[in-house]
Curated annotation (Swiss-Prot):
Residues 326-443 form a coiled coil. GTPase activator for the Rho-type GTPases by converting them to an inactive GDP-bound state. Has strong activity toward RHOA, and weaker activity toward RAC1 and CDC42. Keywords: Coiled coil, GTPase activation, Metal-binding, Zinc, Zinc-finger. PROSITE patterns: F_BAR, RHOGAP, ZF_DAG_PE_1, ZF_DAG_PE_2. The record marks R773 as: Arginine finger. It comes from the Eukaryota. InterPro entries: AH/BAR_dom_sf, C1-like_sf, F_BAR, GMIP/FCHO2-like_FCH, PE/DAG-bd, RHG29_45_N, Rho_GTPase_activation_prot, RhoGAP. Residues 225-488 form the F-BAR domain. Residues 596-613 have a biased composition (Low complexity). The keyword ATP-binding does not apply. The keyword Zinc applies. This is Rho GTPase-activating protein 29. Residues 369-384, 974-983, 1083-1092, 1325-1337 have a biased composition (Basic and acidic residues).
Length: 1337
């Protein structure tokens, strides 16, 4: 136990010695404590870490210092040796290069530490040798080193290393021997040595040897280095430098502001001075005999040239001579200053973190040391008290002591690491400070250089532009001194005409004054008259007291007096006559009230002097007083100031009158917009509110005489409200107002702001990229909104940007309290939009000529018709506005290739605006956000299919076109049947859908008859036409006899006068049930026909027929239709016929014909011959003659079959009368009578009466067929030109045509907008009314 205790004691003593060895010197004032003191003092000055401020006694008698020196020299020697050995390494080139760089960095670090610790070794020889080593090592390219040149390249490096070692040893030996004092050896200030340290560290990172030598060998300290050294010694040097850079930036900013303001004022003044000099030069150039005229003209020219130079100088200073370079330098300084400041703050933060870590480590070390001391003392007491017992307790305490010792050692190591880290951070901070100060210095020097350059430019250019001015002024002053008074006056007198001419003109003036007492002279035709009161009065009126004898006797004195008076009143002198050498003076007499005394001309006259004094001279024959403007009186001083003098180029009084009449008075010089030019402006007489900026106008305001619009003078440049030539109403609250209130003043139900904006966009902005997508400037948009509220529809938009206009339109629609598609229809619209999401979006909208669309799926069509029916429930203003807006958006989408605004993009923009839910809360609900794609989808559908939804025809018919092009029919039988099935749901759908095809129709023209045969085969429909079409634009009507199948004699039809047209069209009832029609067609398929279907057609009765009408017709009921017209009209008034064509068509296939399968027909148009001489016979829809229905044979109208009364076969008789196309303007009237018998068969007689001029031959063709009746009703409108037609069979179900030798089917001519909707069966009441009407006929 004792041995064990002894061993433990020895171990404890050894551990204690090991722990106390590094700790004790920390608390003792030994040499190592200097380092700690230096580290503590470096908190205030980071340069102390480098030893720059540490003054060490260089006495060689201090053995401790000498031992430190020896150790440092040995360490430096080891580093040199390791660097030298790195070049002999057999590793790869990359590894060797890496090792060499590490050894070189270690060498520089050790050398810097040694020189920092021993200031006496800061020698230029050592620094030069070290720089040579660094340069040699950095200059080696290890990739080029091989076995051949290895010895040569590395030999130079070895030599430089040996030189550094030899130099270092010599300096140390000299220092130890005391040959040279440490302070006097170098002879450099301490600051210079610190500069060498920096250069040495920089060279270790790649600086060249020459830079090192320059900095290290320079015997004197430059001003720049002194500045850097002072800032390095200062604790807040970086902050001071940054503050100076900031102050320099602010100073430069102030200088730039002054220069900009000065240059702008100089340019403004130069422009004004140049303008004044131009006008003065023009005036002075016309004065022929005025003194100093040439001098002043030269002065004006010099002034103009000087102002031009001033403008050029100002422009140069604003660009590359002053403003731009200085501003660029200032911006660069601000940017780099911020970066440097952030870098310095990061370094300071690292330093503070290291200091705080060191404090924590010191406290932890002290704490662990105390714990160890306690554990050690406790173990010692235990050993002393119980040396032979308590082994376990002793072992436990020994373990505690060992653990405390281990922790204390760890804390000590951590403290050492923190101290080393703090020292490294101090060195890094010192280096960063040096670099930052150098950067700031370079920046400041560059900024000063730029400021110096621009300042020199400024004063040089100022001196260059003012130098010629003083020289010119000196020359002009010398020239003015040479003038003799009266010189120009003498020249003027010598240039006057001879005495005889003066005697005649003067005697005429005196005679005229004595006889009439007026100042007007009687002049020749080529002289200018001064009958207007604005011309100047002559100054010879004072001569009225002289008689003619005095003038003749004393001519010379008189001439002298005249000259004197002219000189006194030269301001008011008028130009002499220019013909020959004669000159006459205009004078005024007392009787005329036009006299002007000398005192008035000298200074008493107001208007004539103020307006005419610049141009008054004996040679100025164009001087005139401008007339008083219509906007005010001449007594206003502002008017006199704002009026310009008359132009010297005016040559006549008429031109002056025209100018003054068209001038806008006091605002002639103001910059005005297009809208402002429409107003008749005058000065504002009372304070009012400006309609442009909506602020109060007190001074310098303008007011329109017609509409009373008030505006600032400066606002005239941007005024957007035109003059309405009537008093402008008050401000209208337009945005955010109920739609019903806005449309009250709109006759068509569309707000003016929508029409105004869309028309302007369509006129000049359809091809602008991103229209409606790109927003306008907020300030301009708000200004335009205010203009709309102030000026309503008088706002001028031609000067505004299209994006501002589109933004205002979107803003108006967005701010409506309730959108165009009302809230109550939101769910229905969103539901319909959702239905289209799963449909094929690749359905292309292929438009037919009649306005229908093909290629769309049935589901999509059904949804579109639902949308149409839903939108028709909107109020009329909402519906019209929505249709107008969607049509406009469709035009925008048509230019999508240029403006990139497709229907989908427009839907995204206008979807949430036109379709939005009612928000009960303030915020938008999540459901409404989810509905955004559906809203966009619905608007996209409205834009793409707006023709189907809003019943818009593709090309509305023009009633004034000279020829009517051939109509192309694009709906097949299957399409018509699908429409019938779609419309069979409600009678309202039937009536509404009929409006599409009744909107653009004109007069009713019967079918044109042709001889062509039609041939139909399975899978193919070919229409072959031959023969000539008859002219349908005739004036007279003739009757053609027809023969029925029973060989009855022909009877003429009597014209039946129909009721006048109603304003609102209604749909005509249909008798044929749709289900029966579909069932029969599905069962019977396609049958062949060799006849054309019969039809009832109504035509317009001509006002003045050229030929008498024939009344050959059968009257089966023998009732006079003329006497029953009123009763018939009254009973059938609900089914008033509009100017459309109604046909009841019976498809009667012949018996025994083999059935063929039904074939779906595509849209096809019949071929017809075109006659170039045909003209449109379309009559106006309203206010035309009543129409007539002319049956050609007795019988009744078709009555729907009931029960089994009808036989399987019916007999069809068709009489076709045709006239060849020989004239222009023929009108056809066709009457059809269908006989229906209940017992055996149905006999139908079709009589076509064609009225042509008497010279036109007519033909009659009769065809008899027997078949089962199949009827389809087609309502259509026909407007045509001769030579164009379409076979009726194209409008029916698929039929089989007869061979070519059978008579051709009748054709009709249709306009491009004709359409043929099919309708469902009418109710029984309608059938009874129709049957009753047939009996009346």
């Amino acid at each position: 136990m004792f041995r064990q205790g002894s061993n433990s004691g020895n171990k404890r003593m050894t551990s204690g010695a090991r722990l106390s060895q590094p700790i004790i010197p920390l608390s003792l004032p030994t040499a190592s404590s200097k380092t700690l003191e230096m580290g503590r003092s470096s908190k205030t000055n980071p340069l102390n870490a480098m030893g720059l401020d540490h003054n060490i006694a260089t006495s060689g008698g201090d053995p401790e210092y000498i031992m430190q020196l020896v150790n440092d020299v040995r360490k430096f020697s080891d580093v040199l040796l390791s660097l030298k050995e790195a070049f002999h390494s057999k590793e790869s080139q990359e590894c060797s290069q890496h090792v060499v760089n590490e050894r070189l960095g270690e060498l520089v670090h050790v050398l810097k530490a040694v020189i920092g610790k021993h200031q006496a070794l800061n020698s230029s020889e050592i620094l030069g040798a070290a720089g040579t080593v660094i340069a040699k090592v950095k200059g080696v390219n290890f990739k080029e080193v091989n076995n051949e040149n290895k010895s040569t390249i590395f030999g130079e490096i070895h030599t430089s290393i040996d030189t550094l070692a030899f130099t270092f040893g010599n300096v140390v030996s000299d220092f130890l021997m005391g040959d040279v004092d440490g302070g006097s050896r170098l002879g450099y200030p301490q600051a210079r040595r610190s500069r060498s340290f920096e250069n040495l560290s920089e060279d270790s990172r790649g600086c060249s040897q020459n830079d090192l030598a320059d900095h290290s060998l320079s015997p004197e300290l430059s001003t720049v280095e002194q500045v850097d050294l002072l800032l390095l010694k200062n604790d807040s040097g970086v902050e001071s430098a940054l503050l100076y850079a900031k102050a320099w930036s602010k100073y430069t900013k102030d200088v730039l502001a002054w220069v900009e303001k000065r240059l702008s004022l100089d340019m403004e003044c130069a422009k004004s001075f140049a303008k004044m000099a131009e006008s003065a030069k023009a005036v002075a150039s016309q004065q022929d005999f005025m003194p100093f005229r040439d001098i002043y003209v030269s002065a004006f020219k010099n002034e103009i040239e000087y102002n031009h130079v001033l403008l050029q100088t100002a422009a140069a200073l604003q660009t590359n001579k002053f403003t731009q370079p200085l501003l660029a330098r200032k911006n660069d300084l601000d940017k780099q200053r911020k970066e440097i400041k952030e870098q310095w703050q990061r370094e300071l933060k690292k330093m503070n973190e290291s200091e705080s870590a060191l404090k924590k480590a010191r406290l932890l070390k002290m704490q662990k040391r105390e714990e160890y001391e306690k554990a050690r003392s406790s173990t010692s007491r235990t050993e002393e008290e119980q040396p032979a017992a308590g082994g376990r307790t002793l072992e436990k305490k020994r373990r505690v002591e060992e653990e405390a010792l281990q922790k204390a050692e760890e804390a000590q190591e951590q403290y050492k690491a923190c101290v080393a880290d703090l020292e490294a951070k101090k060195v890094s901070l010192s280096n960063a400070k040096s670099e930052i100060l150098a950067q700031i210095r370079k920046l400041v020097f560059q900024c000063d250089l730029t400021l110096k350059a621009v300042t020199v430019n400024w004063f040089q250019m100022q001196q260059a532009q003012t130098m010629p001015l003083s020289v010119n002024y000196q020359a002009l002053s010398e020239q003015a001194k040479k003038y003799e008074p009266g010189q120009r006056y003498s020249e003027f007198v010598r240039s006057l005409p001879k005495e005889r001419v003066w005697l005649e003109s003067l005697s005429q003036d005196i005679t005229a004054s004595s006889k009439t007492g007026m100042s007007l002279h009687k002049r020749s035709q080529n002289s200018t008259r001064s009958s207007h009161g604005n011309l100047s009065q002559g100054s010879a009126t004072s001569m009225d007291n002289h008689s003619a004898d005095e003038v003749e006797g004393n001519m010379q004195p008189c001439k002298a007096k005249i000259a004197e008076r002219r000189s006194n009143s030269s301001i008011d002198m008028q130009v002499p006559r220019t013909q020959g050498s004669q000159r006459a003076w205009s004078s005024g007499s007392a009787g005329g009230g036009g006299m002007c005394s000398d005192s008035e001309s000298a200074g008493g006259s107001s208007e004539s002097r103020s307006m005419d004094s610049p141009t008054a001279s004996p040679g100025d024959f164009k001087r005139r007083l401008p007339r008083t403007p219509s906007t005010g009186t001449m007594s206003s001083a502002d008017d006199l100031d704002e009026r310009e003098p008359p132009s010297p180029s005016d040559t006549g009084l008429s031109e002056m009158v025209m100018e003054t009449a068209s001038s806008p008075g006091p605002f002639r010089n103001a910059q005005m917009s297009k809208a402002a030019h429409t107003h008749k402006l005058r000065k504002l007489r009372a304070p009012s509110k400006c309609r442009e900026c909506d602020s109060l106008v007190v001074f310098h305001g303008a007011e329109c005489e017609e509409c009373s619009l008030a505006c600032h003078k400066k606002c005239l440049e941007t005024l957007a409200i035109q003059c309405g030539h009537k008093k402008l109403q008050g401000r209208l609250h337009l945005f955010g107002i109920d739609f019903a209130q806005v449309v009250k003043n709109s006759p068509d139900g569309i707000p003016f702001i929508i029409k105004k904006c869309t028309s302007e966009i369509e006129s000049r902005a359809l091809t602008i990229k991103g229209i409606y997508r790109v927003n306008g400037a907020k300030s301009r948009v708000e200004k335009l909104c205010q203009a709309f509220e102030n000026g309503k529809d008088l706002v001028e938009l031609s000067d505004l940007h299209p994006h501002d206009i589109s933004n205002v339109l979107k803003l108006y629609l967005r701010q409506l309290p309730e959108p165009l598609i009302l809230y109550r229809y939101y769910n229905d619209v969103i539901g319909l939009a959702k239905e289209t999401q799963n449909m094929d979006k690749t359905d292309s909208a292929k438009e037919k000529s009649a306005g229908e669309q093909l290629g769309l799926s049935t589901e999509l069509k059904r949804v579109l018709f639902k949308v149409r029916d839903l939108l028709r429930q909107l109020p009329a203003p909402h519906y019209k506005t929505l249709q107008f807006l969607i049509t406009h958006l469709h035009r925008v989408s048509e230019q999508a290739e240029e403006n990139k605004m497709t229907a989908s993009n427009l839907g995204i923009i206008f979807g949430p605006t036109l379709i939005k839910p009612r928000h009960l809360e303030a915020e938008v609900s999540l459901s409404s956000l989810v509905d955004y794609p559906h809203q966009a989808r619905m608007v996209e559908l409205l834009i793409k299919h707006h023709q189907m939804i809003f019943d818009v025809p593709l090309s509305p018919m023009s009633p004034t076109s000279p020829t009517v092009s051939q109509a192309s029919f694009g709906s097949s039988i299957q399409d018509k049947e699908s429409k019938l099935s779609r419309h069979s749901r409600s009678l309202m759908d039937i009536k509404e859908s009929a409006k599409l095809y009744k909107r653009h129709s004109s007069v009713i023209i019967p079918a044109q008859l042709m001889e062509e045969g039609k041939e139909m085969k399975t899978g193919d429909h070919r229409v072959q036409t031959s023969g000539e079409g008859s002219d349908v634009n005739g004036v007279g009507l003739t009757s053609v006899d027809s023969t029925s199948v029973f060989n009855r004699p022909g009877a003429s039809s009597r014209m039946v006068q129909l009721r006048p047209q109603r304003a609102k069209p209604v749909s005509r009832p249909i008798s044929m049930p749709i289900d029966r029609l579909l069932n029969e067609r599905n069962s019977r398929n396609t049958v062949e026909h060799d006849h054309s279907p019969a039809a009832i057609e109504e035509t317009t009765e001509p006002e003045k027929p050229t030929t008498p009408r024939h009344t050959n017709f059968y009257r089966n009921p023998f009732i006079d239709t003329q006497t029953l017209r009123r009763t018939w009209d009254r009973q059938y008034r609900h089914y008033d016929v509009t100017p459309r064509t109604a046909m009841i068509v019976a498809n009667l296939p012949p018996s025994g014909v083999q059935k063929q399968p039904e074939i779906s027909m595509a849209s096809q148009s019949s071929t017809s011959r075109k006659d170039g001489t045909s003209q449109s016979g379309v009559a106006p829809i309203s206010f035309r003659a009543a129409r007539t229905l002319k049956p050609s044979s007795p019988g009744t109208f078709y009555r729907p079959p009931s029960g089994g009364q009808l036989k399987p076969s019916d007999l069809l008789a068709k009489s076709v009368s045709r006239a060849p196309t020989t004239t222009t303007g023929a009108i056809y009237t066709t009457a059809i009578t269908v006989l229906t018998t209940a017992s055996t068969s149905s006999v139908m007689t079709i009589s076509t009466a064609v009225t042509t001029p008497p010279t036109t031959p007519t033909t009659s063709v009769t065809v008899a067929l027997t078949s089962k009746p199949t009827f389809t009703t087609v309502s259509r409108s026909v407007s045509g030109g001769a030579g164009e037609g379409l076979s009726e069979s194209d409008l029916l179900s698929p039929v089989t045509l007869s061979p070519p030798q059978s008579p051709g089917s009748s054709t009709e001519e249709l306009s491009p907008t004709d359409a043929k909707p099919l309708y469902q069966r009418r109710s029984r009441r309608m059938q009874e009314l129709e049957h009753r009407e047939a009996h009346f006929v």
